[in-house]
Each structure stands twice: as C-alpha cells, then as structure tokens.
Amino acid sequence: MIKGSSLKRIKSLVMMAIFSVSIITTAIVSSAADQIPFPYNATYPYGAYSCLADSQSSANNLLKSEWEQWKSAHITSNGARGYKRVQRDASTNYDTVSEGLGYGMLLAVYFGEQQLFDDLYRYVKVFLNSNGLMSWRIDANGNIMGQNAIGAATDADEDIAVSLVFAHKKWGTSGGFNYQTEAKNYINNIYNKMVEPGTYVLKPGDMWGGSDVTNPSYFAPAWYRIFADFTGNSGWINVANKCYEIADKARNSNTGLVPDWCTANGTPASGQGYDFYYDAIRYQWRTAIDYSWYGTAKAKTHCDAISNFFKNIGYPNIKDGYTLSGSQISANHTATFVSCAAAAAMTGTDATYAKNIYNECVKVKDTGNYTYFGNTLRMMILLYTTGNFPNLYSYSSQPQQGLKGDVNNDGAIDALDIAALKKAILTQSTSNINLTNADMNNDGNIDAIDFAQLKVKLLN
C-alpha cells in the first residue's frame, strides 16, 4: 500500500516531468504504422560503444532539435515538381544532387517521417535515367544540369536503395509505395549497372569507372550484406569483400588513410585526387557501421587505424584534408572531418577519446554558404554515435519484458535500482545503467516519470 505522502511525492514528480517534457520535446511527424519508432536507444551487436553521449535522453532531444534545423535548411518544395527535394546551399545556388536524396531518405526513415520519405522518393523517380537510377545533379528549378549530369552516382543510389529496404521494414505496405518491390528493383539496377562484371569492383557511376577508377568513400559493405539477404543475390557479398581488398591495397600502412579515388589495385587513378580529402573522409563512417552491425574484423582494423591517426593529432586540431602519409593540406576544422572522425571512434576502446570527439562533433556545426555537406554527415553521425542508427533490416524495438526496473542489470529489482536511477537522472549520465530496463514507460527518455513508475513498482 502506498502512503499518502509517498503518493503525493510521486504525483509531484510525474507532473514536473510532464511539464518539462512538454517544453523541451520537438514534434516529429511520424507514421501511425511505424513498427520501429524513433528514438531507438539501441545497443549495437558489436563494439564497445553504442551511445557516446553522457545522457541518452539529452542526446535524443538534441537529435530532434537538430533534425528540425536540418530540414528547415535543406528540405524544400521549391523546384521539386510538386514533391520535396534536398537542396544544397548558397555555394551551389541551392541545387540538388542525388547524394542528398540518399542522405535525406535515410534521415527521413530513421526519424520516422513517412510522408517526407515518400515525397523525396517521388522526386527521385522523376529523375530516374534509362538505367533506372537517379541522374546525379538537378538545378533549383528542376532541370538536369547538362548531359554529364544524366548519369548516376553510386553512393547516392545505394543509400536510396537501403532506405527503401528500411522503409519496408518500418512501414510495411502502408504509404504510397510498395517499398519491398521498389527496393528490389533499385538494388538489382545498381548491381547490373554499378558493379563491374567479373571483378565485383564497385563502379562510381552507372556510365563510367570500374577497375580503372573507383571511390573508397562509396564502399558501403553493411548495405551490401543487407542487399544480399534481401534479394538473395550472394554476389553482393563478393562486392563487400572486393571493397576491403581494394582498401587494403590503397590505405597507407602507417596512417590507415585511404584516397579519394584509386584503381582496383589501390594506385592513383588517372585524373583523380589521391589524398584523404572530402570524399575519402566518409570511408570510416560507412566502414564503422559494418563493424557495429556485423562485427567485420577488417572494418575494425581500418577504422581503428584512422581513429588513432586523429587521436594522435588531437581532436581540436583535426583539419579538412591530409596526404595519405599524414601531412596536413587544409587549415579548416569543419563538421565534415570532425563528425567522420567521431564515427571512426565507434570501433575503438578509448572511451575518453571517443567521448571527446563525440562532444566535438556536437560542438562543430558549419555556418555560412557551405553548410550542406558537413552538417548532413554530422546529422547522420549524431544518430550513429548515440545508438540511434541500428540496422533497421534486422532490428527489433520490442523491450525485454520482465527486466523493467532492473536499472543496474543485476537480475533483481530493488532499492539499488532506485538509487542507480536517481543518480542517473541527477547527474544526467546514463552510462552505468541499462537503458531499456530504466525506461519504464518506453518513451525513449530517462526522467522523473520513470523514477516515479519504478517507485510504484517497488511499493506494490
């Protein structure tokens, strides 16, 4: 039985929590049919870390706020043929590149915004070329920007394709598309036009490249494992293996850095850059995910080496570009390089450095005329480094029933759990508690409401 004074305290805590949540929560329009809702607060199957933030609930609130800001800057209906598109920034006259649609669709599916997702995909379909892949550059008025822009860019199309797979898992048959059919067709088009026959080398586009020129930052082995299972085409596993084979040949043995462009032998490609620059920086983001989701040993080896390079430099001193041997070629310190450095830290074991580079990622946000690229990568990597970028193809959001309230994960629900939860709330640090068990009401936040519900559970 709950005494009157205890009940009053519980009610007071609940009312304060509801009031505070109502103030700080930013609305995200999601689908009622969402089977895997945001936030995920996931524990990745592999690696020492899933969330680098001190507080999961604070990280989730930050993500909601950043998402609204990103949409305000980069989602527009202007020139979008009645739909929505991702616009770049003033530096490119607010044009659209297919890469942006890939990023935008990934973000929309992770944040659970089905209507936005569908509108972005409708825009994609307007600009599919004869190979069934998206023309890579469209101006702000909805015109393909010349003959060379008709071709597709592989990094964009693979992100579009995997987002369709995730949409199928998240929303099923609801919405304006049969996501399963769309995804399979798109993946098959990529395989037929962007994978070099006989070698499994990933081409940078549907109309050029292969063994003579490829781009390591386009390598997305975690995506290919999903594609293989989703379509039944085991050739995708060969593509993933080939990506690591090429990267092994191209990466510097001391720094671990990979080039923007190379041949399948890892040597410089004619007419293409061979530094660790604005393309190559994405390599560790895509590769780290392959470790977090699938435990691929080479992914950890490659990302650990790059992360050690950045750690030795010092996170405040990271600059936008290096030769493969590690010589600095830029004085800029932007969201592009800082966020991708944070992604690389996810495969390591230095918790102090990982938290420091995560906090730097939160801090460093681009402003001015050049905001699209860095802030978009930062947005996705903030998801990844806070446990909010699980593999939606295989992820289940169902809580572990029967463990609710076992905050300290010792197999019992008792006063020790009350103390652990109280400390976590007061210090805004959730690193030493089981988040799933502590989140009593499954709302993705650890707060006074959970504390009140845990007290009720114990008193009963």
UniProtKB/Swiss-Prot annotation:
Its EC number is 3.2.1.4. One of its GO terms (biological process) is cellulose catabolic process. Disulfide bonds: none annotated. SUPFAM superfamilies: Six-hairpin glycosidases, Type I dockerin domain. It catalyses: Endohydrolysis of (1->4)-beta-D-glucosidic linkages in cellulose, lichenin and cereal beta-D-glucans. GO terms for molecular function: cellulase activity. The active site is at residues 99, 155. Keywords: Carbohydrate metabolism, Cellulose degradation, Glycosidase, Hydrolase, Polysaccharide degradation, Signal. The keyword Hydrolase applies. CDD domains: Dockerin_I (cd14256). Residues 400-460 form the Dockerin domain. Residues 1-32 form the signal peptide. InterPro entries: 6-hairpin_glycosidase_sf (IPR008928), 6hp_glycosidase-like_sf (IPR012341), Dockerin_1_rpt (IPR002105), Dockerin_dom (IPR016134), Dockerin_dom_sf (IPR036439), EF_Hand_1_Ca_BS (IPR018247), Glyco_hydro_8 (IPR002037), Glyco_hydro_8_CS (IPR019834). Pfam families: Dockerin_1, Glyco_hydro_8. It comes from the Bacteria. Belongs to the glycosyl hydrolase 8 (cellulase D) family. This is Endoglucanase 2.
